[in-house]
């Protein structure tokens, strides 16, 4: 059955000489895999250049039962980027977040609130004119809400440790495991959780602190998501912002 929807590009894999497999998070059905024919002429209805990291694609696909790979018939840009492909910092963030989402989101079901969050965030990054150095950090902390991983902030007191394994702040250093962060870093993490895209530029954070926050967030997700790997694009992002 042919259906139209909008998707966010997470990953592209060469399938053979004539086709690619594109992983997208879609408004209609959540995470899904699509077969895209590599165009051989300028008149092709689906162009490979569309499928850039985090690109928003409006497309029509043949959703057939009893298969996990759907063929895309037509595709076009839903909201063409104005800055992400041309800004090396934004491009690096997009590459990192696309890989992160590809590894973190496995849900093959409609989740419109999550899709709306992703779409809003991507468009905000593309159009923002203010500082966005903390964007990926705020994005990942807010993403944890949709994945059921958001830490409990209610019991925080100054001087608390953050127990990453149990996702709670605690006044007592955890004794049964080493997956926790010290009080000074826990306070910085709490500050990060309270930021949003409009206010994050008001919070001062140097490169070392930013890199440490990213390492903590990445480790937090690895603790809570089975088989979450070390991301290849993480080093690229670190080098660019160093």
UniProtKB/Swiss-Prot annotation:
Function: Involved in DNA repair and RecF pathway recombination.
HAMAP family: RecO
PANTHER family, sorted: DNA REPAIR PROTEIN RECO
Pfam families: RecO_C, RecO_N
Protein name (database record): DNA repair protein RecO
Keyword DNA repair: yes
SUPFAM superfamilies: ArfGap/RecO-like zinc finger
Organism: Bacteroides fragilis (strain ATCC 25285 / DSM 2151 / CCUG 4856 / JCM 11019 / LMG 10263 / NCTC 9343 / Onslow / VPI 2553 / EN-2)
Keywords: DNA damage, DNA recombination, DNA repair
One GO term (biological process): double-strand break repair
One GO location term (cellular component): bacterial nucleoid
Domain of life: Bacteria
């Amino acid at each position: 059955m042919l259906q139209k929807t909008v998707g966010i590009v997470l990953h592209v894999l060469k399938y053979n000489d004539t086709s690619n497999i594109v992983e997208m998070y879609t408004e209609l059905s959540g995470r899904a895999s699509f077969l895209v024919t590599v165009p051989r002429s300028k008149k092709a209805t689906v162009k490979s250049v569309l499928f850039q990291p985090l690109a928003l694609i409006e497309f029509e696909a043949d959703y057939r039962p009893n298969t996990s790979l759907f063929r895309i018939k037509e595709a076009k840009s839903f909201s063409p980027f104005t800055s992400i492909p041309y800004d090396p910092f934004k491009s690096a963030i997009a590459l990192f977040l696309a890989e992160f989402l590809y590894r973190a989101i496995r849900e093959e079901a409609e989740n419109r609130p999550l899709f709306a969050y992703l779409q809003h965030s991507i468009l905000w990054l593309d159009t923002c004119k203010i500082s966005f150095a903390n964007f990926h950090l705020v994005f990942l902390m807010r993403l944890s809400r949709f994945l059921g991983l958001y830490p409990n902030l209610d019991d925080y007191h100054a001087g608390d440790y953050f127990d990453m394994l149990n996702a709670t702040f605690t006044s007592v250093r955890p004794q049964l495991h080493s997956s926790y962060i010290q009080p000074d870093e826990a306070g910085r993490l709490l500050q990060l959780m309270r930021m949003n895209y409009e206010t994050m530029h008001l919070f001062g954070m140097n490169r070392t602190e930013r890199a440490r926050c990213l390492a903590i967030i990445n480790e937090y997700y690895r603790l809570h998501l089975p088989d979450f790997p070390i991301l290849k694009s993480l080093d690229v992002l670190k080098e660019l912002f160093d």
